[in-house]
Amino acid sequence: MNGLILEGGARRCMFTAGVVDCFMDNFINFDYVAGVSAGAQIAVNYLSGQRGRSKSVIMPNNDNSSGFIKSKLSFDLNKMAYEYPYKQFPFDFKSFFNSNAICEIVATECNSGKAEYFRETGDEYLLLKKLCASCSLPLVYPMVKIGNGEYLDGSITDSIPFERAFSVGCDKLIVVLAKPIEESATDYSKIKFIVQKKYGTDYPILVETLINRFGSYQEQCKKLYEYEKAGKIFIIRPLRTNVKTFELSKENLENAYTAGYNVAQTDMSEIL
C-alpha cells in the first residue's frame, strides 16, 4: 500500500499545495493519505479532486490580509473550517467521501497528550470539526471538543505521521515537508511559563508534551531520514525558506506554490 504524508505549517503549506496540484495534474493516486494541521486541509482537497482549492484557501483575501494577527488567525480558522466549504470555496464532500483512499486527520488529545488519527466517511460536520481540531494551534486557538475528547493541533504529537502509515499497512511513502532541512519545529520550552500558565492546571500532560515537542520533532526527523536512506520514504521539501508561517505577501505565497509544483514535477520520475 502506498501512502502520502503531508506535514503542517500554516501558510508554509502553500509549497505543499503546489506539490499536490502537480500530483493531480499527473494523475497520481495513493491508497493512504494522512495530513496534519494545514496539511490535513490539503489532504482532503486532494482526495476530493479539487485542484487549486488549497491554494485559494491559503492565499490571504481582502478580509484577512491585514490587521492584528492573532484576531485574524482566529477569524481565519473558523472561516476556513466552517464557512469556506459551503460559501467562498465550496468543498466537494461527495467526491471526498466516495474516494477509495484511506484518509487520516491527525490531532492531539489534550488530556492524554497523545495523537489521534481521525477518519470520516460520511458526516460533513464531523469532517470539518476534525479538520478544525487538527489546525487548532496551542496558545492561539481554543480546544475543539469531539466526543469526550478535547483537541489541538496534531503537530504537537505527530508532525510527520510516517510511523502511523507503516503501522496501518503502507510499505512505501511520499512525505511532503513544509520547511527546508535547516529549519526545525517551534520550541515551546522557550515559552514554558506561558504554556504552564495557559494549560498547567487542567492539562499537565499537554504541558509536558508541548515542552518536549522540539526534541520529539528532532528525533522524528532522524527516523524519517533513516527510512529515506533505506528507500522506504521519498521526501519532497522546499530547498529554501519561501514563506513565513503566517505569511501575508501574496507574491511570496505564489512563489512558494510554484516552487512546490516545480519540485514535484522534477521528482516525477522518482514518484511514479
Segments (PLM) and residue ranges:
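Patatin-like phospholipase
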Residues: 1-36, 44-272
